[in-house]
Amino acid sequence: MRTINFVTLPGALMATRLPTVEALELGGSSCSSGQSSERLKKTGRERKRLPAWFKTSLPVGKSQHKYNATTSSVKEHGLHTVCEEARCPNIHDCWGRGTATFMIAGDVCTRGCRFCAVDTAKNPPPLNPEEPSDLAGAIEKMGIEHAVITVVNRDDIPDGGASHYRKCIMAVHERCPEVGIEILCSDLDGNLESLRSLLEDLPIRVFAHNVECVPRLDNHVRDRRASFSQSLNVLSEAKKIRPDLKTKTSIMVGLGETDSEVVEAMRKIRSCGVDMITLGQYLQPGGRHIPVERFPEPSQFADWDREAREMGFSAVASGPLVRSSYRAGLLWEESTGSEPVVTRESTGSAVSHLTFSRTNGGQTI
C-alpha cells in the first residue's frame, strides 16, 4: 500500500545519524506576530549524540527513484509537505516508498507551539483557491492508496479553515474516488460547528488530531490557544458526529513528562473513544525550540505499546522515530483487523529496531 503524509527536513539529504541536539534554556515572551511565542535563550551548543537506536537509511535503487519522483511531484504542483515543513526524520523512508503527507492551507501557521518547525504569523497569506485542484492532481499522479492531509492552524479565518479543508478533500475524492483519505486536523479553535460542517458526509477514513504532549506540559509546549482538554473534546465530538470514522491522536515524549504521565494520558485519550494512537520521540528542530529533556529507550516504547493495546486501542505505533502519520495506511489497516504494523531495523525503517511479536502480544527488542 502507498500512502501520503506531511512534515519537513533540513537539507536535501539526511545523514545516517540524525542532527545533534542543542542545549537551550527557555527565555520569556509571547507569540502571535510572526515570531516564536516564547523565545529560547541559548546558553551554549552542547552537542549531544543521539542514542544508538536513532539511525535511519538513505534510499537506494528503486527507493531512490521513488524518492526523486515524489520530490518532483511535490515541486511540480507547488505543494507543501509536513515531511519538509516539520523536518520529519522519516522523510527518506516515506518518500522512498512514494508516499508523502500533504499540508494544506499554506505553510504558515497562526499558532506558535514551541516544538514545531512550521513558520508562524498572526496574519498568514490568503488561502490559495487553486490548492484543492493542485492537491488532487498530485495525489492522482502519485498513484497512492491512502492519503494523509494535514493542515496548519488558521485562526485568522472565521471557521478556522474548515471550509477550505473540506474543498481540498472533496477535490481529491472526486478525482481519485478509490483513495482512502485521512485528515490530520487542527482544533479549529474549539469551534464545534466548524467541526460539524467539515465532517458531515466527508469521504474520509480517519479523523486525526494530536494532543501532542501530556496535560501538565501544555503551557510549556503548546500555543496558549491549545490544550489537552480542548484536543480531547475535538476528538470526542468528531466521534459523535461521525461514529463510522476511526479517530487517531499522537503523543510526543522527551519533553519533561514521566512514564506514568504518558500512561495516564493514554487512559484519558482512550476514555474518549479514540481508536488509534502513535507515540514518538520529540526532536528539537531548531535553536528557538524546546530542548529535548530525555530519550526513553526502545524498551520503554515497547511497554507503552503493550499498555496501549491492553487499554483497547485498535492500532498502535510506538517507537523513537514514529510520527503521527508514519505508515498511516498500514496503521489504518491494523485498526480494521489486519496484522500490527511491523517495523524492523533491517528494512531501513525509521522507527527503531522494535518488532511485533504475536507470542507475547506486543513489541519486543
What do the PLM-derived regions correspond to, one by one?
Residues 149, 183, 249-251:
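Structural beta-sheet core signal
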Residues 103-116:
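Cysteine-centered iron-sulfur cluster-binding motifs in ferredoxin-type domains/subunits
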Residues 153-158, 215-221, 285-291:
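A short acidic, helix-capping loop that chelates divalent metal ions and anchors anionic groups
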Residues 144-150, 203-215, 274-283:
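Non-cysteine beta-strand/loop elements that form the S-adenosyl-L-methionine
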Residues 2-101, 117, 137-140, 167-179, ...:
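Auxiliary Fe-S-binding modules of radical SAM enzymes
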Residues 120-147:
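Conserved alpha-helical substructure of the radical SAM core
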Residues 147-167, 256-261:
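Conserved glycine-rich "GG(E/T)P / GGGxP" loop and the immediately following alpha-helix
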Residues 189, 207-228:
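Acidic/histidine-rich catalytic cores of soluble enzymes
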